[in-house]
Amino acid sequence: KNAKLFVNSPNALEGNKTENTANAAFQSSEAGMVDVVAQEDELLESIRTLVSILPANNEDDMSYSECTDDLNRACTDLEASAADPALSLPMISDDNFFFEVKKDYAKDMVTGFIRLNGNTIGAIANRTALYDEEGKEAETFDGTLSAEGAEKAAEFVNFCDAFSIPVLTLTNVTGYKATKCQEKRIAKAAAKLIYAFHDMTAPKVNVIVGAANGTASLAMNNSADMTYAWPQATIGMMDPVSAAKIMYADEIAKADDKNALISEKAAAYAKLQASAESAAKRGYVDSIIAPETTRQIAAAAFEMLFTKREDRPAKKHGTV
């Protein structure tokens, strides 16, 4: 926590009078350069944990361990905790193990490692709420994909693929964050995330736990080997309310009770076009699963994909 990291010394930065850009807090939460911030004893323990779960290389199998947890264990509280993946991912993992990386940076996107059937799995999830140690809501997010979140996830995907670590995603995204600052970076950041997932040769499993709306959903592991959805998930080009307002603009303008008509049309659109059932009928998802069976289904999917091999044509590298 007392370490310093910088390219230019804080007092050498033009216009900077007060902010210490070299301390661990800044490099962790603002720059995204630091994976873990802790005191020395905690940091050493984190390193030991990482060494024990990460393979030595992309062909190493020494990171696998015997699973003592029930693979069919029901995650009864998973749906209630879905807003904060820092709570829901441990429920899916063997013995509630979860090692989060870059937890202070781009908090709308959660990245870390879990264990399934004794195997190390990279986990990526959208966050809409952050809860403190007392279980109280400390911070909320709007469900959109930010440039920082996309970059954070893309770097994590590349790391996992370098070691052939499978990746599980819990998708809940409504669109891209819409601000002038984000507009400068979001296109390139989203492209990097989409490319990272498509370029990945290790097993990929996607579980849509909430919304998968618009082109932002394409960035969240759209190229997964197996895709599942919870029954209440909404999957489509836009959220049902926005779609209803566009499609029935003339009717809404003439209606006496506009809100009632919007709700009616949105519900009809959601059932016909944006429900998990309609997505399954179109082949967008492989199966609709109950939230409490997520651990069981994910473990089975990764077991099936364990021997996945993907041959690539001889070339140098992509340009994204």
Q: What are these model-derived regions, one by one?
A:
Residues 1-320:
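Ligand-binding clefts of soluble mixed alpha/beta catalytic domains
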